[in-house]
């Protein structure tokens, strides 16, 4: 498995890391400021951005004159902040550690291993319209995930375990959060998908944006090939 050699978001699809594909998709909707939570083999991510032009452009190295020329130089309109969130920190703890970087406005949140054709602007507009703390994207997929119990208006009442392909909705991983979400995360050992989301649902502060289009989570080599 490639994930033993590099962080999962840096596994390549079409000669580009899945992280790059996710960022390019967000950028299409005008989201160009990124905060990336680093952990396992974080230097791989840092080196990718430090040498970004080497990965994306044609380059001439003049060894005799110790110089380098970058051809067809294209700069992404991105501002990328890389944060060391710890090697063994759980998902909730990683979110908690970026508190000082996100400001006081709602922010988008996603994982580094999933691709979808979600309308991100519509997702943000839905989040701002209901006034709750958190919005997750609900997708219908026959795989091994916990599922959502939600009302017609998108209000999530609870989570439960999925036993078979019964048409249940799952958290697709594309989310919008208000800073109030940090109050639901205790510390480094907190798993974001457990107590924080469950308590948000219990308090009536968790909503779901339904997505019926493409969605794929790359948990296995087979899913990468798909």
Predicted regions and their residues:
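A structural signal for short hydrophobic beta-strand segments in well-ordered beta-sheet cores
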Residues: 10, 147-150, 197, 208
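Well-ordered alpha-helical segments embedded in enzymatic catalytic cores
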Residues: 18-22, 94-97, 196
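Residues at the starts of beta-strands that form the adenosine-phosphate
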Residues: 32-34, 133-134, 205
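Conserved beta-loop-beta/alpha segment of the NTase-like Rossmann-fold superfamily
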Residues: 47-152
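Catalytic-core segments of class I nucleotidyltransferases/pyrophosphorylases
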Residues: 106-110, 115, 120-128, 140-143, ...
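N-terminal glycine-rich phosphate-binding loop and ensuing alpha1 helix
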Residues: 1-52
